[in-house]
Amino acid sequence: MKNPLSQALRCWSEWRRQQKLHGRFAFGDARMQLGRVILPARLHTWTASSRLANEADITRADDAWQVRLHDSGLSFFWPSEPDQNLHFVIEQEFSAANPHHYTTAPVRLSPESTVLDVGACEGLFAFRAINEHLASRVICFEPSGRMAALLRRGAETNGLADGIAIERSGVGSQTGRARMVAGDNPDAGYLEYLPSGDSHPDAVPVTSIDDYCRSHQLALGPGDLIKADAEGADLDVLLGAGEQIRNGAPQLAITTYHVDDHAERMIAWLRQTRPDYRLRLKGFSFWTAKPRPVLLQASTLR
């Protein structure tokens, strides 16, 4: 069982450490939804179940579950029977109070924006971006064949397929092949690179953002966005976009909670590569026993 005082002190200590390292972690951003982080999970289970029942209709749809959201009218498909945790998947896309929400300031999108969605999973972020005219197109990278198929199904069900491209590929620091390792949840799988020449029945292609943009004659600019939730490969995604970041300064929204030192390493690299970025670090997560910042955002727009 969580000890709230102990958890709060550990978050305070980590916030102080981050402040000393780079000074880019406002206290208000560090304490976003802190009660959810430090209090016992059972206190949130009932609330999440109740909210999920009120915000969505969930029905079996062949080999998946269709989730229809009341407020937005959007639907997405989930591969396993949903539980109360699905509420948090929905909340992070529609509530700016959630530190995992990708499009808070300093990120600013427009109907002309191009978004690269790395780790698109069920596609709810992409659906919202097109539906709310936050972007003209979203290129979704999803290495899981199962999730990529459900993502496509959701795009077609919502009538948004024209604005969404789906690449069944992982994204990392280099182009190659990797095997997809399934996680305990549909949004918690990860990629493991294969040595050159090796094969594996679950192997999937992996690209870097720079290689992808080069091969597709795509140049990202300050109004575009790289969004990434890459289950631990987030720093590799960033490093593999170095050319686009140096030349075009696209906006960034990248998760930082999968690996202990990702937040500070990303900030150090971005300060060296594009010192004109405005940076924002948000929230805490106990993904493991140590509290880690949730999300890093960057933009040169004023």
Write out the residue ranges for each language-model feature.
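Short, structurally constrained coil/turn elements
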Residues: L109, L160, T273-P275
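Conserved glycine-rich SAM-binding loop
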Residues: C121, S144, G172, A233
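Short, hinge-like loop/turn segments at secondary-structure boundaries
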Residues: E156-N158, V181-P186, W269-T273, Q297
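S-adenosyl-L-methionine
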Residues: M1-A135, I139-F141, L150, Y277-R302
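Short alpha-helix adjacent to the SAM-binding motif of class I
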Residues: R146-T157, R265
